[in-house]
């Protein structure tokens, strides 16, 4: 019985949409291959098979981890002592998205990614007594009338009983605007050296943008792409694996284009 239960994570993954769907496609391609006898008719099957295999790989957490280590510059974690030693003046949290239809809160709340960033910033702020800034408006895909992310973050801090934001930048729509508008806000108060909080995979491009805006930046990364799954599960497709490879590829392209 225990042996069967130990297979539960694998069996569950196999029937989930990402893995189960790709296995079904592979099965149909094998069937089509055996039904087809002409070479020219098999070429589309070969192409579809290669594409499906690549999608399988890009949906694996093992591949996401490998890509994050080889495509993106690596950033090391920091602690409170590091920020004090480097004379950081403020902690800046990069927005990570809002869930506008959070019915359990009767209004908007931070996305899980944004909340993770905010929680880490709270930890650093409490350890260093440094003031916090949050940067995030209504993204390009947002709609008029929505609450800005910085305002939602301020509400979240109140719910958590955490220190209030010293600065709210609520007009930016992307990382470039995050940097430009936050830099203007902080410089008016004499702040030039910040600890920047965002996910590790998002950090290299973010640091580049904030330094271009004239701030001295100490990266304070969190949310590294890692996995505590067994090696077998890391090589089975999952929605999380596909999402993580998407993050890495997007950031890699962003670094190439900026």
Task: Briefly describe each language-model feature range.
Residues 1-33:
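Membrane-embedded alpha-helical segments of integral membrane proteins
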Residues 3-11, 63, 67-71, 249-256:
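Hydrophobic alpha-helical segments of integral membrane proteins
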Residues 57, 61-236:
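A structural signal for short, hydrophobic/glycine-enriched beta-strand patches
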């Amino acid at each position: 019985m225990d042996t069967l239960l130990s297979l539960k994570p694998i069996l569950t993954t196999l029937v989930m949409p990402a893995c189960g769907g790709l296995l079904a496609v592979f099965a149909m391609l094998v069937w089509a291959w055996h039904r087809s006898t002409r070479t020219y008719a098999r070429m589309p099957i070969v192409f579809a098979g290669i594409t499906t295999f690549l999608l399988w790989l890009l949906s694996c957490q093992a591949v996401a981890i490998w890509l994050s280590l080889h495509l993106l510059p690596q950033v090391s974690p920091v602690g409170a002592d590091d920020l004090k030693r480097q004379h950081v003046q403020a902690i800046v949290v990069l927005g990570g998205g809002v869930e506008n239809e959070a019915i359990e809160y009767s209004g908007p709340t931070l996305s899980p990614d944004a909340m993770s960033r905010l929680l880490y910033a709270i930890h650093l702020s409490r350890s260093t007594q440094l003031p916090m800034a949050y940067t995030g408006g209504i993204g390009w895909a947002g709609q008029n009338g929505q609450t800005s992310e910085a305002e939602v973050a301020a509400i979240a801090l109140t719910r958590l009983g955490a220190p209030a934001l010293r600065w709210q930048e609520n007009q930016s729509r992307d990382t470039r605007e995050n940097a430009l508008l936050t830099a203007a806000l902080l410089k008016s108060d004499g702040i030039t050296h910040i600890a920047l909080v965002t996910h590790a995979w998002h950090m290299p491009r973010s640091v580049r943008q904030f330094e271009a805006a004239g701030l001295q930046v100490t990266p304070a990364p969190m949310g590294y792409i890692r996995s505590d799954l067994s090696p077998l599960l890391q090589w089975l497709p999952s929605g999380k694996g596909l999402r993580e490879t998407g993050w890495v590829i997007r950031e890699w392209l962003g670094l190439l284009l900026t």
